[in-house]
Amino acid sequence: MRILVQRVTEASVNVDGRQVAAIGPGIMALVGFGQEDGPDFHNRPAFRGMAQKLAGLRIFPGQGELANKFHTSLEEFGGQLLLVPQFTLYADCRKGRRPSFTDAGNPAWAEPMFEHFVKIVDESCSVSVSSGIFGADMAVRLCNWGPVTIWLDSLSLFGS
């Protein structure tokens, strides 16, 4: 599982010209599942570990002396979270100029996995959680804050 975390002042997702999700200050995260995750990934500790890591990242400013430091989590800051499914996080560009996506998870199990991840994150933190639509051609807009962009990989963090 891979997550590209971006701290934003605002973000939104449109599908077919209609807004399906929007947030104010918080995190917009692109979420992808790989073949190495497999259809049972939601049963492994790394699945919940990634949800906890995302919700607990201290990438927001504190108060006073800590105003310019990464001090508070999304929940402490009172921000919002937008999760966007993104299979292209598993692009393989080693050969030629056209990326291969054979390392991306099979949509048959990756779609319910994404929906379950949204549910787990929503249940585990008190912030507003919104999401894009799996498999849709989405227009994603965001305004980076910082910018702050962080890469989370379940293999690197949890060994699975």
From Swiss-Prot:
Q: Where is this motif: Gly-cisPro motif, important for rejection of L-amino acids?
A: 146-147
Per the UniProt entry, the Enzyme Commission number(s) are 3.1.1.96
Provide the alphabetized UniProt keywords. Cytoplasm, Hydrolase, RNA-binding, tRNA-binding
**Which coarse location class describes where this protein primarily resides?**
cytoplasm
Q: Name one GO cellular component term.
A: cytoplasm
The UniProt entry's GO biological process terms, in alphabetical order, are: D-amino acid catabolic process
Q: Which SUPFAM superfamilies match?
A: DTD-like
Question: What InterPro entries has UniProt attached to this entry?
Answer: Daa-tRNA_deacyls_DTD, DTD-like_sf
NCBIfam families reported for this sequence: D-aminoacyl-tRNA deacylase (TIGR00256)
| Protein function | An aminoacyl-tRNA editing enzyme that deacylates mischarged D-aminoacyl-tRNAs. Also deacylates mischarged glycyl-tRNA(Ala), protecting cells against glycine mischarging by AlaRS. Acts via tRNA-based rather than protein-based catalysis; rejects L-amino acids rather than detecting D-amino acids in the active site. By recycling D-aminoacyl-tRNA to D-amino acids and free tRNA molecules, this enzyme counteracts the toxicity associated with the formation of D-aminoacyl-tRNA entities in vivo and helps enforce protein L-homochirality.
| Subunit composition and interactions | Homodimer.
Name of the protein described by the UniProt record: D-aminoacyl-tRNA deacylase
Give the organism, scientific name.
Answer: Desulfovibrio desulfuricans (strain ATCC 27774 / DSM 6949 / MB)
